[in-house]
């Protein structure tokens, strides 16, 4: 991993940590958000750590597992990192579904936090 740019190392580590928390104990996700963080979940907007954790903790499944297909990371001009994830998830006994998620990471007091998070299931309407 040492030959990858630092933003890829940080982004990859964050992604691994995020989905491990999400799949095992969503209530712990508050540690990666701040009060100014924003989440867009399937088009619904949530602002602030408390609202985000409440939303993620109240999702209507008991068990979930994410499988990451690809992840891309870029540095931003203001020293943040933008990360995009494409993968699949399986919730309870539901069929496997694709998803896309984007994170904007910012270093605050020597810790990387998520200031912006956007999630969508990869569902398509052909009409």
Swiss-Prot record:
<keyword id="KW-0906">Nuclear pore complex</keyword>
<dbReference type="GO" id="GO:0042802">
    <property type="term" value="F:identical protein binding"/>
</dbReference>
<dbReference type="GO" id="GO:0090204">
    <property type="term" value="P:protein localization to nuclear pore"/>
</dbReference>
<keyword id="KW-0963">Cytoplasm</keyword>
<dbReference type="GO" id="GO:0005654">
    <property type="term" value="C:nucleoplasm"/>
</dbReference>
<keyword id="KW-0539">Nucleus</keyword>
<dbReference type="Pfam" id="PF02136">
    <property type="entry name" value="NTF2"/>
</dbReference>
<dbReference type="GO" id="GO:0051028">
    <property type="term" value="P:mRNA transport"/>
</dbReference>
<dbReference type="GO" id="GO:0017056">
    <property type="term" value="F:structural constituent of nuclear pore"/>
</dbReference>
<dbReference type="GO" id="GO:0044613">
    <property type="term" value="C:nuclear pore central transport channel"/>
</dbReference>
<dbReference type="InterPro" id="IPR032710">
    <property type="entry name" value="NTF2-like_dom_sf"/>
</dbReference>
<dbReference type="GO" id="GO:0006606">
    <property type="term" value="P:protein import into nucleus"/>
</dbReference>
<dbReference type="GO" id="GO:0005829">
    <property type="term" value="C:cytosol"/>
</dbReference>
<dbReference type="GO" id="GO:0042307">
    <property type="term" value="P:positive regulation of protein import into nucleus"/>
</dbReference>
<dbReference type="InterPro" id="IPR002075">
    <property type="entry name" value="NTF2_dom"/>
</dbReference>
<keyword id="KW-0811">Translocation</keyword>
<dbReference type="GO" id="GO:0006611">
    <property type="term" value="P:protein export from nucleus"/>
</dbReference>
<comment type="subunit">
    <text>Homodimer. Interacts with RAN (GDP-bound form); the interaction is direct and regulates RAN nuclear import. Interacts with the nucleoporins NUP54, NUP58 and NUP62 (via FG repeats); recruits NUTF2 to the nuclear pore complex a step required for NUTF2-mediated GDP-bound RAN nuclear import. Interacts with CAPG; mediates its nuclear import.</text>
</comment>
<dbReference type="InterPro" id="IPR045875">
    <property type="entry name" value="NTF2"/>
</dbReference>
<feature type="domain" description="NTF2">
    <location>
        <begin position="10"/>
        <end position="121"/>
    </location>
</feature>
<keyword id="KW-0509">mRNA transport</keyword>
<keyword id="KW-0007">Acetylation</keyword>
<comment type="function">
    <text>Mediates the import of GDP-bound RAN from the cytoplasm into the nucleus which is essential for the function of RAN in cargo receptor-mediated nucleocytoplasmic transport. Thereby, plays indirectly a more general role in cargo receptor-mediated nucleocytoplasmic transport. Interacts with GDP-bound RAN in the cytosol, recruits it to the nuclear pore complex via its interaction with nucleoporins and promotes its nuclear import.</text>
</comment>
<keyword id="KW-0472">Membrane</keyword>
<dbReference type="GO" id="GO:0031267">
    <property type="term" value="F:small GTPase binding"/>
</dbReference>
<dbReference type="GO" id="GO:1904046">
    <property type="term" value="P:negative regulation of vascular endothelial growth factor production"/>
</dbReference>
<protein>
    <recommendedName>
        <fullName>Nuclear transport factor 2</fullName>
    </recommendedName>
</protein>
<keyword id="KW-0653">Protein transport</keyword>
<dbReference type="InterPro" id="IPR018222">
    <property type="entry name" value="Nuclear_transport_factor_2_euk"/>
</dbReference>
<dbReference type="GO" id="GO:0005637">
    <property type="term" value="C:nuclear inner membrane"/>
</dbReference>
<dbReference type="GO" id="GO:0031965">
    <property type="term" value="C:nuclear membrane"/>
</dbReference>
<feature type="modified residue" description="N6-acetyllysine">
    <location>
        <position position="4"/>
    </location>
</feature>
<keyword id="KW-0813">Transport</keyword>
<dbReference type="GO" id="GO:0005640">
    <property type="term" value="C:nuclear outer membrane"/>
</dbReference>
<dbReference type="GO" id="GO:0061608">
    <property type="term" value="F:nuclear import signal receptor activity"/>
</dbReference>
